[in-house]
Amino acid sequence: MASSQGPAPSLRGVGGDEVLRLLSRLAVGKTPPADASVTTVPAPALLDGRRVRALVVGGTGWHVVAADVDPAWVAAQVAHDPIEAPLGARFLSALADRVGGEPGVLDALLVALPAPAAPGLELVETGPGEHPRVRRALAHRTDVRVWTTPDGTALLALGRGVCGRWETGVEVQPAVRGRGLGTALAAAAPALVPGGEPLWAQVAPANTASLRSFLAAGWRPVGAEVVVG
């Protein structure tokens, strides 16, 4: 088990106490043992009471399946390959059928600890508007807030997702990409989180430009996840 850099930061939310504990430990680098374990816990929720049908989180040699299903069913489904199967297409499809949902995309899960300093990038808070990234945030998060650069060429959205964790997403218009703006947005985001809580980001592994931006801004990859909505 990885050693902690200190006490876990405060992470307040609702639903899925086991998921909250896992996230709090992951935030400070304290990971489950790489023992091929697949742990089933109850499904989490959003702050407004909406239930997440299922969430699968995994790291090096461990997985957590957060869903209101029989743990014995999960164990039987992944017994042939507990290292790879929990985030594999076959199990995720079966889980989605079991809970009556649709599997989302597989994302890399990254975290940034609270930042005491003000954002190092000039940002203007604005209304939600019609940007696709903001519409998606409104569909999957609560307490959504949006900032843009003064010229409107880049956007940062912040909101509370699974178990009330703070999550962010950034977008840079194609005409201004390649100038480090994505990295600047990723670096600025943690300072916008109220209450000294960690901030999370889900990045598609194929989106290498976004992944590089978050890593360059000091974000730490802690696993992968799929949300079944």
Feature-to-residue mapping (PLM):
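N-terminal charged segments
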Residues: M1-G104, V124-R141
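Conserved GNAT acetyl-CoA-binding A-motif
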Residues: H63-A66, G164, V193-P205
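Short, compact, well-ordered microdomains
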Residues: G101-A108, A112-L113
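Short, charged/polar, Gly/Pro-enriched secondary-structure boundary elements
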Residues: A115-E122
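Conserved beta-hairpin
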Residues: D143-L156
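A conserved beta-strand-loop-helix scaffold within acyl/acetyltransferase catalytic domains
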Residues: T153-R165, V170-Q173
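Conserved acetyl-CoA-binding loop-helix of GNAT-fold acetyltransferases
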Residues: T168, V172, G178-L192, S210-A216
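Conserved beta-strand-loop-alpha-helix junction that forms the acyl-donor binding cleft
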Residues: A201-L211, L215, R220, V228-G229
